[in-house]
Amino acid sequence: MRILVSNDDGVDAAGIRMLASVLREAGHEVTVVAPDRDRSGASNSLTLDLPIRLKRIDHYTVSVAGTPTDCVHLALTGLLEFEPDIVVSGINNAANLGDDVIYSGTVSAAMEGRFLGLPAVAVSLVTRNHDPKHFETAARAAVEIVARLKADPLPADTILNVNVPDLPWNEVKGFEVTRLGNRHRAEGCIAQKDPRGNEVYWIGPAGREQDSGPGTDFHAVRTGHISITPIQVDLTRYQALEKVASWVGGLSAALDQPA
């Protein structure tokens, strides 16, 4: 298969290098289009106010001064001379579990591929303190999942969010299909002063696990399993439609009132 690989940790990150290498060893034609530096937490942001510069590192690798979404968007709307068969994003050097997917550049790169009509997979290694031991395990999981997608495609609106425990391949307990869990509210921001006495702030850590029982992505990786969560872009809260619809009459009546 022709595979577009991207990430949010940057084009030189160990995870993306391992992913591209193992996919090539499996016989795939891999092109890497990735940010020129770490863009973790970039979510789905597109650069619209500046031109996007890039550097062609070699025939198969492009470094982009932009977000993960920029990378995939450019690749699929004009940069590449061919249409890939699938987008694989990763390997992220940290978990993307539960609410993390809203902020994740790794997941957003895959999501942009899905927006533009391609199957898409986001792969993350659940590391401790960003100290990865077994990127090869996550890469092998990606190879297996790509093979399965080729043989048995999913519906067109589906993205796979894959989280892999940081274990040797032979210590992984198996694969589990999961739903997204969620976290408690994020911890507070961290206030500091710069050398000139001006206030500066750092975003605080993500909240601790809250909804993390059996069936969730949190539980799967905690018990040594590879979590596969099918996700989609439709953010509609269908359970609230009827309640909100009950307001509409009153809201519409306000249109008849004087301004």
From Swiss-Prot:
The keyword Hydrolase applies. Its EC number is 3.1.3.5. A divalent metal cation binds at D8, D9, S40, N92. It is found in: Cytoplasm. It comes from the Bacteria. It catalyses: a ribonucleoside 5'-phosphate + H2O = a ribonucleoside + phosphate. GO terms for molecular function: 3'-nucleotidase activity; 5'-nucleotidase activity; exopolyphosphatase activity; metal ion binding; nucleotide binding. It is an enzyme of class 3 (hydrolase). Coiled coil: none annotated. Its cofactor is a divalent metal cation. Gene3D superfamilies: Survival protein SurE-like phosphatase/nucleotidase. Its main location: cytoplasm. Binds 1 divalent metal cation per subunit. One of its GO terms (cellular component) is cytoplasm. Keywords: Cytoplasm, Hydrolase, Metal-binding, Nucleotide-binding. It holds the Pfam family SurE. HAMAP family: SurE. Belongs to the SurE nucleotidase family. Nucleotidase that shows phosphatase activity on nucleoside 5'-monophosphates. NCBIfam families: PRK00346.1-3, PRK00346.1-4, surE. This is 5'-nucleotidase SurE.
